[in-house]
Amino acid sequence: MESGEYVPSYMWNQNGWLCERLGLTPVSQVQQCFPTTHSTDLVSSTLGMTIRAGDPTGMSAVVTTETKEGITIETECIGKVYGPEDFDRNDWSFYGEPEVSIHVDRPATVELTCANLINRIPALIRSEPGYITTDKLPNNRYIVGKITDYLD
């Protein structure tokens, strides 16, 4: 944290994927990182330690992408040790006409992550040989039957 140097967060790629899917042309992209803290001591069983009040508990990474079309995409990812009042949350806001906000409190994060990986398998099997970037894969499909039924 003290060095101020960070590798791109996974939101860096998300902005590129969103631009690709929306037909936008990125002209600049920057990332800002901010430490997260908590007002009281936090006991982390995962880290096997207590994080003192005011010490960093994680980081917020904000990625801003400007496009040739004049549309700005800003994404934020927060990874931190949770306090007792914290929970997973997904918030999406679209500013324009009309403005739209979507808020999902306590999504089934583990299940969604696993389902996303499994549902991606048919697209990976059908993809061209060699290295391709994931923005070239089709949108993910929800599999409700046998995976072989999706391999047409």
Name what the model sees in each region.
Residues 81-152:
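C-terminal helical cap and adjacent loop that interface with cofactors, partners, or active-site loops
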Residues 1-80, 84-88, 107, 114:
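Active-site-lining helix/loop region of Rossmann-like oxidoreductase modules
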